[in-house]
Amino acid sequence: MLKAIILTGAVAVALVIYFSLSLYVFPQSYQAIEARKPQAIVTNVSLSAPDIALGQALTISVTATNNGEDADMQIVSVGFPNLTATDNIKILKHNFDQTPILIAPGKLLSSEYSDTDSSVLAQYASIEVFSRPWEAGKTYSAQIEAIPNTEGKFVVFIKSVALPHSWEQAHYPQRGILDQQKEFVETYSVEVTKP
């Protein structure tokens, strides 16, 4: 009988310690950890030509770096507001850790630099290349081909976003025009002419 009382008391003390740790100590220690600060930056963008003939392929080369602390993930997005389908886009080569993702109009996307808080439907075609994780100081590159299907100005949007998105430097650029996700982009363009 005495052993049962001691055992019951020991179990009760262990449960009190466990719940105290899980309800107070662990949450406080996790909240005290400062979020990492990755710094996304696109270091180089080049287009294969300033002018192309209709039906001719345009090659976009993009290089990005994480100049901050390690990122859980960093994405480089290349958007094509003139294209309403992904048929004319392909990745030529890349050294990112994950497989690039083609995004067709109508796909649900996160927006305003949030993971899931805010979302929008894609209005135009784009491609996302990314690495998970993306270590501090690491650089990745990709070459993407797009074939414009109309004459006139063919626009390319480029941006990079690092997660956790814990400060303004986690996205690049920090200002400019907003894309379909209400995120800043750099704009590039070529003139498409009759062949």
Question: For each of these PLM feature ranges, what is it?
Answer:
Residues 7-22:
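Hydrophobic membrane-insertion alpha-helices, especially the h-region
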Residues 30-52:
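Low-complexity, acidic Ser/Thr/Pro/Gly-rich terminal tails and inter-domain linkers that flank the onset
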Residues 55-69:
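Short beta-strand elements of extracellular/lumenal beta-sandwich folds
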Residues 65-70, 83, 149-151:
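Short solvent-exposed strand-capping/beta-turn motif centered on an Asx-Ser/Thr pair
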Residues 74-85, 159-161:
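Short acidic, flexible loop segments centered on an aromatic residue
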Residues 82-123:
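A surface/secretory-pathway sequence property marking extracellular, secreted
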Residues 131-152:
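Low-complexity, intrinsically disordered segments enriched in Ser/Thr together with acidic residues
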Residues 168-195:
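Short beta-strand elements
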